[in-house]
Amino acid sequence: MLPATLGLRQNLRQFILLVIVNAFVGGMIGLERSILPLIAEQEFHLAATSAVLSFIVVFGIVKAITNYFTGTLANRFGRRKLLITGWIIAIPVPFLLMSADQWTWIVVANILLGLNQGLAWSATVVMKIDLVGERQRGFAMGLNEFAGYLAVALVAFLTGYIASHYGIRPYPFYI
């Protein structure tokens, strides 16, 4: 077996794929940030501030705990398996958000989303660093964050636009 070749140019295809995957991870957050406060107020009659705090706090705690274990899990089971597991966990999230008839289901969706983010986002970070090596680690991290947060902004804008024209459920979730 040949030794792995490090560097962005040498691994550009895999790197671009991981940037795209990370953008999808960020897109899930963008969808939530624009739509859930509206759902909280209009459908569940919750104050937007309370609602935002409840789902963001739950998401943040779960993501932080998952991040803590992700490095060890990645070394034990492999980065690819972690990334796939993170996405499998995320599959029900849009469906839960689209059909939730109680705020509890929104919170449950955010627990799953926190697990997804902790596994998938973190796995893409580690995988990118593995591909480019230590010398280009900062650049890899910068692209990772740029792609993720650009997707947050674009999807938040797009879902907000869709919600303002077609309603807050279900159309924004089809993205």
Across the structure, where does each feature detected by a protein language model lie?
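Helix-loop boundary and gating motifs at the non-cytosolic
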Residues: 9-60
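Short hydrophobic/alpha-helical segments at membrane-entry points of transmembrane helices
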Residues: 18, 104-110
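Cytoplasmic helix-loop-helix junction between adjacent transmembrane helices
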Residues: 111-148
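A membrane-interface helix-boundary motif in multi-pass transporters
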Residues: 164-175
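C-terminal ends and interior cores of transmembrane alpha-helices
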Residues: 88-101
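Residue-level signature of mid-helix packing/kink "hotspots" within the transmembrane helices
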Residues: 60-68, 153
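Helix-to-loop junctions at the C-terminal end of transmembrane segments
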Residues: 66-78, 163
